[in-house]
C-alpha cells in the first residue's frame, strides 16, 4: 500500500509539471518564438530575432463563461505543414505555405468545457486563434486578447479606412485604431498587427489599456453568436527590419485562409477598369474603344443605371436611369454596350448598392450572368456586425456560383478570403 501511494503521488507531480510547463512554438527558420503560459492566467509572449516584440500579454475570451482566469493548459499537439499552392492571380505564381503549428487544449477550473488555442508560426509571422469544439450555442461577448509592446513603441494610428495615418506613441489616443496596425519598435524593428479569415465575426479595433502601459486591447464591434464547432479569426503579428518587408510578406494572410473552393477559375481575370460617366449607349461604346486603345480590360457603369441607388424601390433588374444623372431615361441600351464590349474583348462591370443587393441578390445574379457581364461592384456595404460580415462573404460565394467577379466599395478590409473565393478582387 505504501508503495502504491508513493507511485500515485509521484505520478501526480509529473502530470502537474507537464501541464504547468509553457508551450513554445518556433518558426521554421527559428526567427520567431511564441510562448504560451498558464501561470494563473493564460498569456503569451513573442520574440523575433531574439528580441521581445510582444511582452507577456493576456489571452482569453468570454463565451458563455469568462475564459480568462483559472485557465490551464491540458495538452498540446505539434505539426508541420510544407507545401506550395498556385493562386489564380497575384504577385507570385506560386505561394509557399510553410509553418509549424500547435493545438493547445485548454480547460477552466470548475468547467467541463474545452477550448483550443491554435498557433501557427511561419517565417513571415505568427498567428493564433480560439477554437471551440462540440455542438453548443456560443455567445462571445468579449475577446481578451492583448498586445503589450516595448516601451517607446510608436503606432501608425488611423481611426478607419478613410482617415489619415498619424505616428503616435501608445498613450493618449483620442479614439480606437483600425487594423492592420503598423508599429515602429524602439530597437529599430517594425511589426504589424493584423487579422485573417474574418468571415463570420465582428469588426475589431485596437484601444489602449487604462490599466497596463503600452498595451493594446481588442475592441469588438458587438457580440458574436454561433454554434460550435467554431473559431475566431486569426490574430497575426508580423515583424521585419524594414517596413517594406512586411508588405512583401502579405501572402501570410492568404495562407491563413482555406484553399480555393472554385473548381473552374478560368473566368476570373483581374484587370484595369474605367468608369463610364454619361450613362449612354454612345458613351459606353466610346469608352470600350478607349479601353481597347489604352489596354484596359473592363468598363464600369456606376450608380444611376437602375435608378436612384438609395431608393429601395429602385429595381436592379431593369435599366432605369436616375434622372439626377441623366434626364434622358432611355439613353442607355445596356445590352447593346455589353455585346459591343464583348466583341472587342472588354468586360462590363455593374454597380449595385447594398440596398438592392440585400433585396434582390438571388434574382439579379442569374439575370446578370445571362446579360453577359463580368462582375459586380458592391456599393456601400455595411461593415462591423457579424450579420453583415457573414452576409457579405456569403454574397461573394453566390456570385462565384454564377461566374461573377466582385469588387467591394467602402470600408471593407480584405483578410485573405480571395484565396478561398478568388472572384473577390
What are these regions (language model features)?
Residues 1-9:
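Bacterial N-terminal signal peptides that target proteins for export
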Residues 15-17:
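N-terminal signal peptide c-region/cleavage motif recognized by signal peptidases
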Residues 22-259:
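N-terminal accessory beta-strand-rich subdomains and adjacent acidic, glycine-rich linkers
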Residues 108-110, 121-123, 151, 240, ...:
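Short, flexible loop/turn elements at secondary-structure junctions
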Residues 134-136, 280, 382:
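A generic structural motif
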Residues 230-298, 302:
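An acidic-aromatic substrate-binding cleft motif
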Residues 303-425:
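Aromatic- and carboxylate-enriched substrate-binding clefts and catalytic-loop regions
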